Amino acid sequence: MKKFFFVLLALLGMTVIAAEKTVYDFNLNSIDGQSTPLSTFRGKVMLLVNVASRCGYTPQYSGLEALYEKYKDRGFVIVGIPANNFGAQEPGTNQEIKTFCTAKYHVTFPMMAKVSVKGSDITPLYAFLTDRSAHPSTGGEIGWNFTKFLVGPDGRVIGRFDSAVEPDSKQLTSAVEKALANLK
C-alpha cells in the first residue's frame, strides 16, 4: 500500500510539472497578421522585447538586430512586440511599424502585431510574463519600452532586463551566451 501511495504521488507530481505553463502556450499575431504560436520557436533561446518607434530607446533596434545577426545561426531569436503603453510612443499601424523598422533599422528578426503589455487590456503573454507568482525573480509590471525577457529553449523565462540594458551590454550578451551554451 505504501508503495502504491508513492507511485501515485510521483505520477501526480509529474502531472503538475507537465501542466506548468511556458511561453510556448501563447500565440501572437505577426506584424503581417498571421497567427504565430510561440511554440514555433521551441528549442531556441528567445528574447522577447516590447518595442516602440518614438521612444528614447528606439535606437536599440540597431543593437537588437546586431545581436540577432550574431547569434541567430546558433539557435537564438529575437521577437519584437510593439506596444503603445508608454507615452503613446507606438501610435502607428502594424504596417507603419513594419515599414519604420525595416527602412530605418533594417530589422530582420520576427516582429509581432501591436499589443498591450500592461493595464486592463494586457495581452495574455504579458500577463503571464509579469505574474510574480509564476515568475518571482522576473515578474512585475513592465516599466517602459524595450524591457527584455530572455527565454530558454524549454520556454521558461530565465532573465529580465530593463530598458536601459543595451543589447550589446555584457550583462545581456553574457546571459544569451550562457543560454546558448546550454542548448542540446
Give the positions of each predicted feature:
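Short, internal strand/loop/helix patches
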Residues: V23, N27, Q95-N145
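Thiol-/selenol-based redox modules, centered on thioredoxin-like
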Residues: P124-A127, D131-K184
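Conserved helix-turn-beta segment immediately C-terminal to the redox Cys motif
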Residues: K44-V45, R54, P59-I81, T102-Y105
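Thiol-based oxidoreductase modules, predominantly thioredoxin-like and allied folds used
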Residues: G75-G92, T108-G119
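N-terminal "domain-start" segment that seeds a small globular fold
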Residues: I17-S39, P124
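Amphipathic alpha-helical repeat scaffolds
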Residues: S30, N50-R54
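Sec-dependent N-terminal signal peptides
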Residues: F4-G13
